[in-house]
């Protein structure tokens, strides 16, 4: 983002930081970084001319001088010893001598074994992304490599290219050969047991899903162009079946006759139907375009099409805010494909099983399952009238980690549903739908669909597939090259503007030639991120998974700040962070019952060891400690349970300090709300504070440091609900109407660290004329992402895909930000002295408006 970055200079020198005075002395339209003072000049890196180079100015911020003239790669990571400057440019390190005005490329030879580039074996389950089976074989993808083996014994064979490749979207053919997507060239690829590799050399864009017919002769292909194609293996005929205008056609299934197939079809931004098609080209919509239907799956006998639908709208009252929500809306349904009885309403006479698909009146043959709604995400029809239902628990953001689901089986004969397996990552059925393959966190298991699994049993009896047969070998150098190129290709294919990446091929050449110079996975991340930076677009991220580094040792937290007391040789408690003790991790352990330490108390020893060094070093990898504390001249011994993470406590302390300050300065007239992001935490924080603040005469909404997200519209919706009157009652104070409506005066504070949806909130706050916006210009990144693509080592990469365009200003927020109505900065000395000029200005403006209204 091209901020107007600033450098500050101390113009009044004093040894105490809180006595220093800083003035803005340089402003450039670009990124200014790594400031270094050498003699009477300030040196720094800046990209205000396009490519980052080394510059300097005098101590008055004048006489801007350029010292380097690199035109291809950025100068980065500058440092100085007070006389000279070193910095990085591409894979080289340069030394600049200001006195001699001399630039020198350093010849650095590091005699190391480059251990991180050496080959290694990895655990198969740690990187297993897909697994599938038929009646004989099981195939899976781990670390982007395809392995094939028999269910219970025999060797595991690696198919296709062994290194430098990334396969995905695996499908098994009846003979055990596989069909996959090769992400190196985005081609549909056939991998044979005999080692041969065949490709469908047609440009279909980024293939998102493939589904092979039961006989292995036809393949459905969906892509990022929102198209659905049908490929006939024997004739090599390729036909376009359908195309959406809204989203990827993501789910398909084949009828057992190999002629009919069903697929999801996005009808709008929020609705999706299911269509039924014949290989002849006939296509019909069989569910309403006004709901959200998904997960089509045929009964293996060809009688029914099962699917899930989020259409059961049964609202419940929210327990916190005056609102209603739909907690569980997804229900399983089936379509009777021929004009016969529903399985839930059998006739007295025996009916024959009819596999024929009858189109006429099919939309009237949609029947709900006799089960309650739940958070179902998948349905699969299996042999012997079994139907598998996979659901996830509903949980909030405070419960991180992988979400494991519940797998249930519904029996069409008995009309009952029972638990089949819990803590499931994913599952798939064999081609004949007679066996089920379940992926757990610690195993892959295969069962007959009629068998109740014994998850406590071991070996074959417990359905456990022996994965020790698979050896996943990784050649880092070849893998890094593949990952880099895939990250480049994903950007090429998913970037929001088709012609937006000019000369993208030259960008590949520019950075790919540096790959041989990297030695660690971290350096690969750095290289990918530099390549992504060439888009000059926000939200271009690489999120690494496998740095292969030692886990950092955790440091327990006391929820306090300290100062070393030289006289008593102990750490004096300078501040105890006070949060909300009713919230987890928001109470300082020093204030726990039985501990009750205070500011000024001095920690003399930890676990009997006298504190001689930084106190944090005594809290490493500990959950609980015994402290010897000098309090009121006496030594007290207390046992303290440490915090694993202090950030929630410190954040709550900061918010509550601001809120109390606003209340005191306004004499209770103004409320205060801080929104840390526009995601789950931000939504919770807004209502946590708004519920106790909305009844006041005015409100300050603070979105400084807002990390973005997607719920700004929900916050604005509440702020736009203006108070039109009151509900008067006999006892108690009157209630605002509408309830939870916003007060008449609102002032918002933003800054340069509010971005993405924080940018959007800041802009719409002004546009809706909700009040005055003060602070600093925002981050400037409003082209959104859908992080769905992962590289071979599970690292995630994003591509800017969704550009936010406003009627009046178009795309101008991107790479610029949102200007406040009134600019107010916070200088370093303000931070040092605990002052907040932005908050003070907001209070002043809100009180002035209240006075004018009265």
From Swiss-Prot:
Name the catalytic site residues: 539, 756, 814
Q: Which Pfam families match?
A: PD40, PDZ_Tricorn, Peptidase_S41, Tricorn_C1
> Secretion signal: which residues?
none
Q: Does the keyword Nucleus apply?
A: no
Documented EC number(s) = 3.4.21.-
What GO molecular-function term can you cite, just one? serine-type peptidase activity
> GO CC terms for this protein?
cytoplasm
InterPro entries named in the record? ClpP/crotonase-like_dom_sf, PD40, PDZ_sf, Tail-specific_protease, Tricorn_C1, Tricorn_PDZ, Tricorn_protease, WD40/YVTN_repeat-like_dom_sf
PDZ-like: where is this region?
A: 554-646
- Which residues participate in substrate binding? 709
Protein origin, superkingdom? Archaea
- One GO term of the biological process aspect: proteolysis
Q: Which residues form a coiled coil?
A: none
Is Hydrolase one of the keywords? yes
Q: What is its main location?
A: cytoplasm
Gene3D superfamilies according to UniProt: 2-enoyl-CoA Hydratase, Chain A, domain 1, 2.30.42.10, 3.30.750.44, Tricorn protease N-terminal domain, YVTN repeat-like/Quinoprotein amine dehydrogenase
Role summary? Degrades oligopeptides in a sequential manner.
* PANTHER family (alphabetical): TRICORN PROTEASE HOMOLOG 2-RELATED
Belongs to which family? Belongs to the peptidase S41B family.
What's the protein here called? Putative Tricorn-like protease C-terminal subunit
């Amino acid at each position: 983002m091209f901020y107007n970055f600033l450098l500050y200079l101390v113009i009044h020198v004093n040894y105490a930081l809180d006595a220093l005075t800083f003035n803005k002395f340089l402003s450039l339209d670009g990124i200014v970084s790594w400031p270094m003072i050498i003699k009477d000049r300030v040196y720094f890196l800046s990209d205000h001319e396009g490519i980052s180079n080394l510059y300097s100015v005098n101590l008055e911020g004048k006489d801007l001088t350029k010292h380097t003239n690199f035109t291809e790669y950025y100068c980065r990571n500058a440092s100085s010893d007070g006389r000279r400057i070193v910095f990085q440019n591409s894979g080289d390190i340069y030394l600049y001598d200001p006195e001699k005005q001399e630039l020198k490329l350093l010849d650095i030879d590091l005699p190391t074994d480059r251990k991180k580039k050496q080959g290694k074996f990895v655990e198969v389950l740690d990187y297993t992304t897909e697994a599938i089976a038929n009646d004989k074989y099981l195939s899976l993808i781990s670390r982007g490599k395809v392995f094939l083996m028999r269910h219970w014994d025999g060797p595991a064979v690696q198919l296709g290219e062994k290194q430098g490749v990334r396969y995905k979207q695996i499908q098994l053919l009846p003979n055990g050969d596989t069909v996959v997507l090769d992400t190196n060239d985005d081609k549909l690829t056939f991998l044979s047991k005999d080692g041969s590799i065949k490709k469908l050399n047609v440009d279909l864009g980024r293939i998102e899903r493939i589904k092979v017919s039961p006989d292995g002769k036809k393949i459905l292909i969906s892509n990022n162009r929102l198209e659905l194609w049908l490929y006939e293996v024997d004739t090599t005929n390729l036909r376009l079946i359908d195309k959406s205008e809204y989203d990827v056609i993501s789910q398909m299934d084949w009828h057992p006759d190999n002629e009919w197939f069903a697929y999801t079809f996005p009808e709008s931004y929020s609705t999706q139907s299911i269509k039924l098609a014949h290989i002849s080209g006939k296509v019909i919509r069989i569910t309403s375009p006004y709901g959200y239907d998904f997960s089509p799956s045929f009964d293996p006998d060809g009688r029914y099409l099962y699917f899930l639908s989020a259409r059961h709208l049964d609202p419940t009252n929210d327990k916190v805010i005056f609102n209603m929500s739909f907690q569980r809306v997804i229900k399983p349904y089936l379509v009777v494909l021929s004009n016969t009885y529903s399985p839930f309403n059998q006739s007295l006479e025996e009916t024959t099983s009819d596999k024929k698909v009858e189109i006429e009146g099919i939309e009237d043959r949609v029947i709900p399952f006799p089960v309650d709604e739940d958070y179902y995400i998948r349905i699969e029809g299996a042999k012997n009238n079994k139907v598998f239902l996979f659901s996830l628990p509903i949980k909030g953001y405070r419960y991180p980690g992988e979400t494991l689901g519940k797998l249930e089986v519904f029996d069409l004969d008995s009309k009952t549903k029972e638990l089949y397996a819990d803590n499931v990552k994913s599952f798939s059925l064999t081609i004949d739908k007679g066996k089920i393959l379940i992926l757990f966190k610690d195993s892959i298991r295969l069962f007959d669909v009629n068998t109740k699994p014994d998850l406590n049993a071991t070996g074959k009896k417990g359905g456990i597939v022996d994965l020790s047969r698979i050896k996943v070998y990784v050649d880092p150098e070849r893998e890094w090259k593949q990952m880099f190129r895939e990250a480049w290709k994903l950007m090429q294919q998913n970037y929001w503007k088709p012609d937006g990446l000019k000369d993208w091929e030259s960008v590949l050449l520019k950075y790919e030639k540096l790959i041989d110079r990297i030695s660690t996975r971290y350096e690969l991340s750095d290289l990918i991120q530099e390549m992504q930076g060439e888009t000059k677009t926000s939200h271009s991220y690489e999120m690494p998974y496998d740095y292969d580094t030692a886990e950092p040792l955790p440091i327990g937290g006391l929820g306090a700040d300290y100062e070393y007391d030289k006289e008593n040789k102990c750490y004096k408690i300078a501040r105890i962070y006070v949060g909300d003790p009713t919230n987890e991790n928001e109470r300082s352990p020093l204030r726990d019952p039985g501990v009750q330490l205070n500011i000024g108390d001095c920690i003399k020893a930890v676990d009997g060891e006298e504190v001689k060094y930084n106190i944090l070093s005594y809290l490493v990898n500990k959950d609980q400690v015994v402290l010897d504390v000098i309090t009121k001249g006496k030594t007290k011994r207390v046992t303290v349970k440490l915090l694993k993470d202090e950030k929630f406590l410190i954040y709550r302390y900061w918010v509550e300090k601001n809120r109390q300050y606003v209340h005191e300065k306004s004499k209770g007239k103004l409320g205060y709300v801080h929104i840390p992001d526009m995601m789950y935490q931000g939504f919770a924080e807004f209502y946590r504070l708004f519920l106790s603040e909305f009844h006041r005469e005015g409100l300050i909404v603070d979105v400084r440091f807002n990390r973005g997200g997607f719920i700004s519209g929900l916050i604005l919706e509440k702020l736009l609900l203006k108070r039109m009157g009151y509900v008067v009652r006999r006892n108690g104070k009157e209630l605002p109407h509408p309830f939870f409506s916003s007060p008449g005066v609102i002032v918002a504070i933003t800054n340069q660290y509010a971005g993405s949806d924080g940018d959007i909130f800041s802009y719409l706050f002004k546009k809706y004329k909700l009040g005055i916006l003060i602070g600093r210009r925002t981050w400037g990144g409003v082209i959104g992402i859908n992080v769905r693509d992962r590289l071979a080592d599970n690292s995630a990469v994003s591509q800017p895909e969704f550009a936010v365009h406003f009627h009046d200003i178009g795309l101008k927020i991107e790479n610029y930000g949102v200007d406040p109505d009134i600019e107010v900065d916070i200088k370093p000395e303000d931070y040092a002295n605990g002052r907040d000029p932005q908050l003070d200005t907001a209070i002043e403006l809100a009180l002035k408006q209240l006075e004018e209204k009265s």
